[in-house]
Each structure stands twice: as C-alpha cells, then as structure tokens.
Amino acid sequence: MAKTSPVVPPIKLSEPTESGNDTTETSGRLKHLFRDQPLIPIGCAATVGAFLFATRAIRRGDSMRANRFFRYRVLAQAATVLAIVGGVFMERKMKQEKRMEQITPK
C-alpha cells in the first residue's frame, strides 16, 4: 500500500490590518503605508526625485549641480531610513502600551 503524505494547510502571507482590510493587493498596501507612515513614501519620492535631477544634470554636463543633487539624495535617503527606524520604534511602543492596557485591570 502506498503512503499518502499529510495535507499541509496553505501559508497565509498577509494578515488583515487593524481596520480589517486585507493587504494582499498592492493598492491596499500602499494605502496602508501612506495612512500609517506618510514620511516613508515621501522620503522615497524625494530620493528618486533628487536622483533623477542629478541624472539630468549629468546629461547636460553640469557636474556641480549633479553633485548638489547627489548630496540631496543622500540626505533624503538618510531621512527615509530615520523615518523607517522611528516608525518601527513607535509601532513597537504602541503595541507594548496596548498590551499593558489589556493586562492592567481598571
């Protein structure tokens, strides 16, 4: 008799957010990101914009302007990383406070 392998349930890659929306769709994820942490997409857009302006300056042969925009890119990228790290810490703190509210009797 042949052995049959056990049926393994599928892995769910995303969970519904606190508002109940499923974040599997790209538009849902973007809306969630813009609503919860708006500085991250703004920083990403600033980074890309600075890089595009630097590229345009290089094509025109304006190396001083290109260097200035590359510096702006580094600043925008650093601000974005700080926003990500700050968002992680804030979210962790909010989860801890929520957990403490559930544990602490009123």
Curated annotation (Swiss-Prot):
Its main location: mitochondrion. GO terms for cellular component: mitochondrial membrane. Pfam families: HIG_1_N. Keywords: Membrane, Mitochondrion, Transmembrane, Transmembrane helix. The chain crosses the membrane at residues 39-58, 73-90. It comes from Schizosaccharomyces japonicus (strain yFS275 / FY16936). This is Respiratory supercomplex factor 1, mitochondrial. Associates with the respiratory chain complex III/complex IV supercomplex. It is found in: Mitochondrion membrane. It comes from the Eukaryota. Residues 16-27 have a biased composition (Polar residues). Residues 9-102 form the HIG1 domain. Cytochrome c oxidase subunit which plays a role in assembly of respiratory supercomplexes. Coiled coil: none annotated. It is a multi-pass membrane protein. The lineage of its organism: Eukaryota, Fungi, Dikarya, Ascomycota, Taphrinomycotina. Residues 1-28 are annotated as: Disordered. Belongs to the RCF1 family.
